[in-house]
């Protein structure tokens, strides 16, 4: 696999992992996610001309989907990461003489509280960093530590973290052994996604502030003092004058993490003076005046009691460790990931071993290795990978350098359920009213087997099931009906074709294919002609779309659109387009000069396309213009200069767009 293909694969993987994480169902440990990001970052540094566009490393947060969307007054950004004392020292060197507060990095759900003339008027989740969800009703009902009124006039915005305390989490699970919560972080996120506060009334959350924005003179310049004056608690803050003091504070926080009543996954360093913090400004996706120091993963020892093998939507079979219960990072862990058989062999892990369980980033536990192989008793048992699929009994195959196992039986029951869940996911058909548990039950009952079967469901059929009432059944059917307008791009995502990523689907939608059937008929030669689609991806598309042709026909018969949607097409070029015939590359953070608001790079690229340009992801000899925003990378500038590419500031392009009445 060449560098370009690997970069595209990693970029698509990051999008997939982020979506799962923010849906409350993370697929990998934080450490594994960080490794994917780090590999992509290193490849882009080595091959800046191959940087993906949009670049997921320039984006923050989760897609906002619940409740009414609200645009933030200023972006809620992620924090730059640090893991070494040298990085802490470098942070202090950037701001000589400025005091810094160090506080625990809480592991919950970020919120923005907006007060106007002393009254709470809105509570909004971080969402995608630019737009979040209005959860005011839920916050008022369920979140402690949020005053309804404050003694400050004008507009005040307090940002912070809503967490479920460990004591609340343990008490809830003790009272609900049949439906325990997974961990406090997921519980906090799930609570504020509830449709009705009454359904989650026992799940109390607690708010801790970490940011404050007021009119001039509206609060103390010192962050901690400003929050306290409003009656809002902040996570314990320590004022530090230099890097040595800050590192000592970080060490103290890490040592005391198990004594806290809330989960943390690091420490935050931030300029103590609010004016200095604001003056420091931002990068494309993080504030300059703050830093997140990530702790090493928490580890505990326990006994590996058994290994089971789970089957995914593409037939991939992965080992899952079943563990003697152990308390790690604020939750009791009974299972963990083992990745694949190569990892098992490399770490020489056996059933019966005392193993190290690591909860990286305090999210997904995994087996890091054997504590001491020399102390084995001889009763330990080798972990033998299956030769048959644990779901359907068909022979398995090995693929790739990691010798990953796959079931190739398209009718495998486990794959069927996973594929149905994937079709209903947000990235695909977005059938949000039917969760995975109900999809599994409907599949077990023989009602659902293929995506097209969703569109034969009736309210009367759903009401035959226990625990589905009139309201739930109506919501399910309405959700299914809304999904009929899925279109080419999202339908292709939903069909879970191996090697065909979300990026593949987007490129096909923009390449002139009118429908999914036309893609199926295209043949490998035409597919390879599409930008960034290689022979392996083309072969996979041909093979699987040929197999799925009867399913495409059933979807059509049941009123599902497989045609390309207007939103996925290249934009119509305006008459007298100022950038006609130009190939452009956009780099850096883009902001609308009329409002000062940040503009997503894909949005700006689409505006350039309306102005007649062809947007490319990397600088080459064919590039006409490199359009630069804030924080532009030196590597792209150097390459553009070397190739003789004209470099223009975004302000010049904005002026042309405004004059052409394209914005």
UniProtKB/Swiss-Prot annotation:
It catalyses: NAD(+) + (deoxyribonucleotide)n-3'-hydroxyl + 5'-phospho-(deoxyribonucleotide)m = (deoxyribonucleotide)n+m + AMP + beta-nicotinamide D-nucleotide. Residues 574-663 form the BRCT domain. It comes from the Bacteria. One of its GO terms (biological process) is DNA repair. Its cofactor is Mg(2+); Mn(2+). NAD(+) binds at residues 30-34, 78-79, 126, 161, 294. One of its GO terms (molecular function) is metal ion binding. Keywords: DNA damage, DNA repair, DNA replication, Ligase, Magnesium, Manganese, Metal-binding, NAD, Zinc. PROSITE patterns: BRCT, DNA_LIGASE_N1. Its EC number is 6.5.1.2. It is an enzyme of class 6 (ligase). Belongs to the NAD-dependent DNA ligase family. LigA subfamily. NCBIfam families: dnlj, PRK07956.1. This is DNA ligase 1. It comes from Nocardia farcinica (strain IFM 10152).
